[in-house]
Amino acid sequence: DALPISAAFANLHFIGVGTPQQRGSYAADTRYVEAVIEDLVPKLEGDHVIFGKSTVPVGTAAALQAKADALVAEHGNKATVEIAWNPEFLREGYAVKDTIEPDRIVLGTRGNGPDPQPSRAEGIAREVYAPPLAKDTPFIVTDLQTAELVKVSANAFLATKISFINAV
């Protein structure tokens, strides 16, 4: 199990799991994202940032932050955990290229928005993404909800474009 090793030796963790559509519903199934938080957070000690990459409904990151805070309190581990949302924009067949050379980087943190709180996520993101940022890749820092909405909107726009071209 790599999770205890990751918890012990990393202070940045990425969640990139599927969020399929729920059966008989249009809602996203976020149980896999939630499971990562439930499994990882109790093993953490020290300062940690978790970047969510998955497409999730607006409000999920804030709910995951509340869950992480509750797990830290429940397990009594000496950890601070910050959830940030950093959606990916990968084209089919270009995943590696789009990861190394993204056309934009979006980061949602709790340090932005109507009730800002101190955030370590932006500084860490600037370190992680230093190579593309050095090439002037747009870096958009916003609140959690807006970052989630940017990804959902991009997916909806792509689906609309595909529907229109299929109709032609």
Go through each PLM region and give its residues:
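Short, small-residue-biased leader/transition segments that mark boundaries at the very start
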Residues: D1-L3
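An anion/phosphate-binding loop that grips the pyrophosphate of nucleotide cofactors and donors
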Residues: A8-N11
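Redox-cofactor binding/interface segments in oxidoreductases and associated redox assembly factors
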Residues: H13-I15, G52, L107
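Short glycine-/small-residue-rich Rossmann-like dinucleotide-binding loops
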Residues: V17-T19, T55, G111
